[in-house]
A protein has these predicted regions:
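Short, acidic/polar
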Residues: 18-28, 95-104, 150-156
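Active-site pocket-lining/capping segments in soluble small-molecule metabolic enzymes
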Residues: 4-6, 55, 60-64, 68, ...
Length: 327
């Protein structure tokens, strides 16, 4: 069974976290079929040991002897343990050649591998395939780093090739890691992961994350950005409206988003007709005239034309028509 463990909370040590938001974040992870979540001792103390049920709890704990202080935690990560019992040994891997050392690993040793950020950028495909084969044989929890901007791809490919594999990720990839939401959707699209489950709660997870960190996720962030389904280009709009699957690997509703046609300097007649249809006015206004007005305003303001501005243009067209009729 594929397992995804989210370690976002370990990356928020410097933020003024609130218990209610952390609890809500964990509950939302569980609703998204995330297998487990990782805490630090500080976050555990903030939660007062009151951990939501339904997911497996892990903790980053350098000293294994202190594990008795944290009831409710199922497993502990440490670089100073043998990987047996309740402990998972953390190993940093900086080069694919170091994976050969995993061949001597005993079956009862639990491992987590961090690093491997350059696994996908080798010129030889054979090197990558040998590395992936060694990973599958050892079956560690894979926690790739994102220095080469391919951690999410490495994590997803590991799960695609190893259907009993486990990866560790963070929301939006915070902390230079693979992004939880990207790995979930990659597995949904490629492997039909949880085919009967909706991931619309990802939008809720985004909102909770923003509240916890007092930040705003950029609009075009993959999977969870608010603007990833905003379309402007005339040809693009025409194609998406005719057959969305040609342009979108998953429907916006799957992740709690919605598609929106944006008016701007790259718009075409299809965009204008689409907007007019939204207002049930598709046969009432000259499309080419409105399109010219939209492009002029977009260039002038250096951005998109809002719905309010478009309605103003429609009113101006009405005034123009009345003036011509009276002249």
């Amino acid at each position: 069974m594929i397992k995804i463990i989210d370690a976002t909370l370990t990356m928020l040590e410097e933020y003024p976290l609130k218990k209610e938001l952390v609890y809500e974040f964990a509950r939302t992870l569980e609703s998204l079929c995330i297998w487990g979540a990782v805490l630090t001792p500080r976050v555990y103390q903030l939660m007062e040991g009151d951990l939501p049920q339904g997911i497996t709890w892990y903790m980053e704990l350098p000293s294994p002897s202190e594990s008795v202080k944290y009831p409710g935690i199922h497993l502990f990560f440490s670089s100073f343990c043998d990987g047996t019992g309740k402990y998972i040994r953390n190993i940093q891997v900086n080069d694919v050649s170091e994976l050969r050392g995993l061949e001597c690993t005993r079956p009862d040793n639990r491992l987590r591998l961090t690093g491997l950020d350059d696994l996908l950028i080798y010129e030889s495909r054979d090197i990558y395939e040998r590395g992936m084969k060694l990973l599958i044989q050892a079956s560690p929890i894979l926690y790739p780093e994102n220095s080469c901007y391919c951690a999410s791809a490495i994590a997803a490919d590991y799960l695609q090739n190893h259907h009993n594999g486990t990866v560790m990720t963070t929301f939006t990839g915070i902390g230079n890691k693979a992004a939880t939401e990207q790995v979930i959707l990659a597995m949904r699209v490629v492997e039909r992961y949880k085919p009967n489950n909706s991931f619309e709660k990802l939008a809720d997870l985004r909102n909770i994350f923003e509240a916890m960190t007092n930040t705003q996720i950029p609009g075009h962030t993959p999977v969870v950005g608010r603007k990833i389904f905003y379309i402007e280009s005339g040809l693009h709009v025409d194609g998406v409206l005719k057959k969305p699957s040609n342009y979108e690997s998953f429907p916006p509703e799957l992740v709690g988003a919605s598609r929106k046609v944006i008016l701007g300097k790259h718009s075409g007649g299809t965009s204008i007709r689409y907007k007019l249809k939204q207002y049930q006015m598709e046969d009432c206004y000259p499309v080419e005239h409105l399109l010219e007005m939209v492009k002029r305003l977009s260039i002038k303001k250096g951005g998109e034309v809002t719905d309010e501005e478009f309605l103003t243009m429609m009113s101006e067209c009405d005034k123009y028509e009345k003036a011509n009729q009276n002249s």
